[in-house]
Amino acid sequence: MNLLLNYELFLAKAITFLFIIFITPFIFNIIKRKRTDQKKFKIILLEEKYKNIKKDILLSKMNKLEKKKWIKEEKKKDKEFEKKNKNNIVTLKKKTLFVLDFKGGIHAHEVIGLREEISAILLAANKDDEVLLRLESSGGVIHGYGLAAAQLERLRQNKIRLIISIDKIAASGGYMMACVADYIISAPFAIIGSIGVVGQLPNFNKLLKKCNIDVELHTAGDYKRTLTMFGQNTELTRKKFCQELNLTHEIFKKFIKKMRPCLDIENISNGEHWFGTIAFKKNLVDEINTSDNILMSKMKEKYTLLNIQYIYKNKKLENFTSFIIENIKIIIIKIFSYKKIL
């Protein structure tokens, strides 16, 4: 008996200790995050990054005497350039290419950063500046990707040229974003298209009946709930659900046709996807290339290359918990979701 009591006391102490070690810091992080603004912009001057890479490679090929001579010559060139352009505002006259990255998940949560990045660009951009968005997304919920596409439209409305580069995939909702661009670039084997809508969910009604479990589902309005996981689905509700899918598909098609009038929309909106080279022949993209080549060519054209990133200053614990929670949510959504997925 004493042994059992001692064990229970030990167990209580162990649980208390684990709570203090793991849960308390997490609670403090949440409180701190509420009190302080954890968001900020990170701006990277890409041409400096490439120049430093070039410098490191060149120096690695030289012996000590060559390195010394090369560094001396470079310093001399820099001094001459500074002296020559001392009274000239050269940088303000140069065109700027703002580089953004969007790697979208099923809910397009990344639009939180995209909207801030676009707002920042609109505040600072000149009329000849351009935006390059490196896009990677296989699509997701319509309201998420609809908002992402609407954010990109802000650039078109302000007459700022938008280039979208697809190195891997821009399918479904991803292509909804891509079609907003003035110019679309795709890698040869990138996946493009999938202009369709899907909605699915399991129904456990028969299983629950076998277990003698009743489900109460009451709605005000005939179509407040169409398909349900636990209630009994009828032909009427199934028909309504399919109507909603078709309506969403029609809106999707109209949006793409508006953004890219050159497309034969009925031919390419059957849900099929293609590799970049085939998508080019179907006018889904304008050029076969990679984002890296675009950056190099713009650098040769003397553009200032600015990579704009809106980031959160999350702690490692927050990153880890967010990663676990997000992946669990994605698995559950893929199994049970009835939302309209682009």
From Swiss-Prot:
Claim: Transmembrane helix is one of the keywords in the record: yes
One Gene Ontology biological process: proteolysis
Keywords: Cell membrane, Hydrolase, Membrane, Protease, Serine protease, Transmembrane, Transmembrane helix
Transmembrane region(s): 10-32
CDD domains referenced in this protein's UniProt entry, alphabetically: S49_Sppa_N_C
A GO cellular-component term linked to this record: plasma membrane
Enzyme class at the top of the EC tree: hydrolase
InterPro entries in the cross-refs: ClpP/crotonase-like_dom_sf, Peptidase_S49, Peptidase_S49_N_proteobac, S49_SppA_C
Gene: sohB
Protein name: Probable protease SohB
Subcellular location: Cell membrane
The protein's role, per its UniProt record: Possible protease.
Species per Swiss-Prot/TrEMBL record: Buchnera aphidicola subsp. Schizaphis graminum (strain Sg)
Catalytic residues as annotated in Swiss-Prot or TrEMBL: S172, K224
